[in-house]
Regions:
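Small-residue-centered hinge/linker elements
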Residues: 2-107, 122-123, 127-197, 250-300
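Conserved short-loop catalytic and cofactor-binding motifs
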Residues: 84, 113, 173, 205-206, ...
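Generic non-transmembrane alpha-helix signal with a bias for helix starts/N-cap capping motifs
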Residues: 93-96, 118, 211-212
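Short, well-ordered beta-strand core segments
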Residues: 109, 131-132, 224-227
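Glycine-rich beta-to-alpha transition loops that act as phosphate-gripper elements at the mouths
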Residues: 110-118, 206-210
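Short, well-ordered alpha-helical microsegments
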Residues: 119-122, 234
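Flexible, glycine-rich surface segments
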Residues: 184-238
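Extended, charged amphipathic interaction segments
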Residues: 213-215, 230, 234-264
Length: 300
């Protein structure tokens, strides 16, 4: 008759082995789950949109595509708009401004002003949740310019209905329209900046003189929220989106990567046109009708 050796019995050893095996399987499952989740769940992104040329209808087209892509991309949790522009066409600027406001309703948007963010470019920036700028960034120039076509005499064979069919109105009426657009620009800046984290300190009249300010002054007057780098703006967007781990991406690159075939080809051609567009000329002989601009245009 044999006796069990001192220590654990076979039954006890079997139970211990099962526990160890179960623990190993649990650890392996956790590790596998981690790597699986890492591969299947996309890393949250902060998307960067660059506005680095004059504001035109062509730019409006590309900005519309990028803003819509950023708005609809589930993995893009926040957006930084890097702005370096003297402004441009009033209508194109208004369109981009309204789109930025819509974007901020779905995810945080931070404007990062580079060397120059003037006129329409500044208005686009005030559509963001917050504005960052460098101490030497040029900010402001809130006003409107009207570009007139070269005067031409109507042919005697040209017949029009009504006294203003050819001209659109009197010189006085055009000036009144200019004043209306100026007031609208001023009011949009005052409304947006009055509720900003660093609220506006200037009166509506002081805002709308067309003056420019450097970033240090703009911070003091409440035209921007913080002095800081592009990286600071990105970190702020991530903070507002409650992100600690994230990837920074160029929205243009992400958008183009989503296209194929003819759609990609036509879009690349559009971007090429934007990158090579000539500077706006308010007195061009090719201008067919008066046009309103929100453009920083230093007089020579």
């Amino acid at each position: 008759m044999t006796q069990e050796s001192e220590g654990t019995t076979p039954t006890e050893r079997s139970g211990t082995e099962k526990i160890v095996l179960a623990a190993i399987l649990i650890v392996l499952a956790v590790v596998a789950g981690y790597y699986l989740a890492k591969n299947l769940i996309p890393t949250p992104k902060i998307g960067v949109i660059y506005l680095d040329t004059q504001v035109t209808d062509l730019l409006d087209d590309t900005m519309t595509r990028e803003i819509n892509y950023a708005k609809n991309a589930d993995d893009i949790k926040g957006v930084v708009m890097v702005i370096n522009s003297p402004g441009g066409g009033a209508a194109a600027g208004h369109d981009i401004y309204f789109q930025v406001r819509k974007l901020r309703e779905t995810k945080p948007v931070i404007a990062s002003m580079d060397t120059l963010a003037a006129s329409a470019a500044y208005q686009i920036g005030v559509g963001a949740n917050e504005i960052y700028a460098k101490p030497a960034s040029i900010i402001g120039n809130i006003g409107v310019i009207m570009g007139q076509p070269s005067p031409e005499t109507l042919s005697e064979r040209t017949i029009t209905t009504g006294p203003f069919k050819a001209t659109g109105g009197t010189a006085t009426s055009w000036l009144q329209m200019l004043d209306l657009l100026h007031a609208d620009f001023r009011d949009s800046v005052v409304a947006e900046r009055s509720k900003a984290p660093n609220p506006l300190k200037l009166s509506p009249e002081e805002v709308a003189t067309g003056e420019i300010w450097v970033g240090v002054e703009a911070k003091e007057y409440g035209l921007i929220d913080q002095l800081g780098s592009r990286l600071d703006a990105i970190q702020r967007a991530a903070e507002l989106a409650n992100l600690k781990n994230y990837q920074v991406v160029d929205v243009r690159d992400e958008y183009l990567a989503s296209l194929t075939g003819d759609q990609l080809s036509s879009t690349l051609k559009l971007y090429e046109k934007v990158d090579n567009q000539p500077e706006l000329n308010l007195t061009s002989e090719e201008t067919k009708w008066p046009t309103f601009y929100q453009l920083y245009l230093p007089l020579e």
